[in-house]
């Protein structure tokens, strides 16, 4: 059991209580909760995650960053499969845990290119993105984008953040005057 392993590895950690919340007995999804307490007289240390340098592996991300962003993110990257994450400072070692996301999902490394994630568009400020297609709040183009349709822009800038009133809501890839929609399919409106 993960909790027992954690307590065995961390002196001063004591399991107070644990509970499984079954989905058929509560309203909502099922969960597991454990209350662990550090004894006052014990020093409970948490190992920090060691990240290896990924200079060669993230070359395509760095190219994307140079071409489409106005910032350089620090080198706290983790690669899981083809998914690239920006890991928070002082992130504990979670190697033995099943983790859904290791931090900010930057995007996916594909053959000879990087495809930015929806989360990255929400993380960045508009001034940190080189190309922003701004849409006014009363413009019907917003609904075209949210439905997953292409938008005619008349430009060919590559990756562009689509923003409403200056707030980025997602990505599009612009080529030959058309912005191809990269808004996540699960978030698109269907009416």
Predicted regions span which residues?
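A residue-level signal for beta-strand positions that form part of recognition/binding surfaces
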Residues: 12, 18, 33, 83, ...
């Amino acid at each position: 059991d993960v909790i027992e392993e954690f307590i065995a590895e961390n002196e001063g950690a004591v399991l107070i209580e644990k509970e499984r919340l079954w989905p058929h007995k509560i309203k909502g999804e099922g969960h597991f909760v454990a209350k662990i307490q550090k004894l006052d007289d014990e020093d409970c240390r948490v190992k920090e995650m060691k990240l290896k340098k990924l200079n060669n592996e993230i070359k395509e991300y760095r190219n994307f960053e140079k071409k489409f962003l106005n910032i350089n993110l620090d080198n706290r990257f983790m690669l899981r499969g083809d998914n690239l994450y920006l890991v928070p400072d002082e992130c504990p070692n979670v190697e033995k845990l099943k983790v859904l996301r290791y931090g900010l999902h930057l995007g996916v490394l594909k053959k000879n290119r990087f495809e930015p994630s929806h989360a990255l568009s929400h993380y960045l400020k508009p001034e940190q993105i080189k190309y922003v297609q701004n849409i006014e709040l009363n413009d019907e183009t917003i609904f075209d984008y949210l439905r997953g349709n292409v938008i005619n822009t008349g430009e060919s800038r590559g990756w562009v953040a689509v923003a409403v009133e200056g707030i980025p809501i997602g990505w599009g890839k612009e080529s030959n005057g058309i912005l191809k929609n990269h808004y996540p399919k699960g978030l698109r409106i269907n009416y």
